[in-house]
Regions:
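Iron-sulfur cluster-binding electron-transfer modules in prokaryotic oxidoreductases
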Residues: 1-252
Length: 252
């Protein structure tokens, strides 16, 4: 996200700032990458990387671990920090859980007049198959997106993007990813008629962007917090409508 999806991180920061938690968070310099390759091939590496993450949290004296829009990193931390750290484990949250909590408590406001496009949502396998993160993003989207439409099937039964398990990083498998799983996913996306496809996972975003380009689908792939960044009201800042007007001028 630092290199490929900066708007996602900007959306994260905007939520923290608007919620009044601007001075309560940080990003660890010694363990800023949430990828845990041990999840693919080695329990020993899985445990070692988890302990490196926990060591960094302890160095920073953090009370909670907040994972951004990455299905892999979220699952690795959420499922295996308690496994390996036991009673010493810090609570782990996906950023969408934090954002929804802020929304419910009235700590942030999202302008429902900003997003006029039809929006749909893709469920990343790593956070949806277990039923952990399914309803939260939909509740957030419905709070400020007038034209939200779900995929079919959805939630735990949603189709994989086709790039999971490391496949998205293998260029030699591009044709396979596009013509097998990608074809099914493209047809599913097309049926929604969506102009914006929300995918809160870097792996999924890369695969879905390639699918959209390959099948020439008329939609844009982005993260949930990319979209939130458009509509969030920033205390003391310009309104979402003013920011939208400015963005339109730059796009001309």
């Amino acid at each position: 996200d630092y290199l490929m999806e900066p708007d996602t991180l900007m959306g994260n920061a905007a939520v923290l700032y608007a919620a009044g938690d601007w001075d309560k968070w940080t990003i660890g310099l010694c363990n800023y990458d949430g990828i845990n390759y041990g999840l693919f091939y080695s329990d020993w590496h899985l445990e070692n990387i988890i302990k490196q993450l926990v060591t960094e949290v302890e160095r920073l004296q953090g009370r909670n671990i907040l994972i951004g829009e990455c299905g892999h990193a979220s699952r690795a931390a959420h499922d295996f920090i308690p496994t390996f750290m036991g009673k010493e484990a810090r609570p782990v949250y996906n950023f969408m859980e934090y954002t929804l909590d802020c929304l419910r408590r009235g700590k942030i406001k999202l302008d429902p007049t900003i997003v006029t496009e039809r929006v749909t949502y893709h469920d990343p396998c790593n956070i949806a198959r277990s039923g952990w993160i399914v309803d939260q993003p939909r509740e957030i989207l419905r709070s400020f997106v007038p034209d939200f439409v779900d995929m079919a099937p959805k939630g735990e039964d949603n189709y994989c993007c086709g790039g999971g398990g490391g496949l998205v990083s293998i260029d030699e498998l591009h044709d396979y990813r596009m013509e097998i799983a990608g074809k099914v996913k493209a047809e599913q996306i097309e049926r929604t008629g969506a102009e914006l496809l929300i995918a809160p996972c870097a792996n999924c975003k890369k695969q879905l962007k390639e699918i959209v380009e390959h099948y020439e689908l008329p939609c844009t792939v982005m993260g949930l917090h990319d979209l939130i960044l458009r509509a969030i009201e920033i205390p003391g800042g310009r309104s979402p409508a003013e920011r939208k007007e400015e963005a339109a001028l730059f796009a001309m």
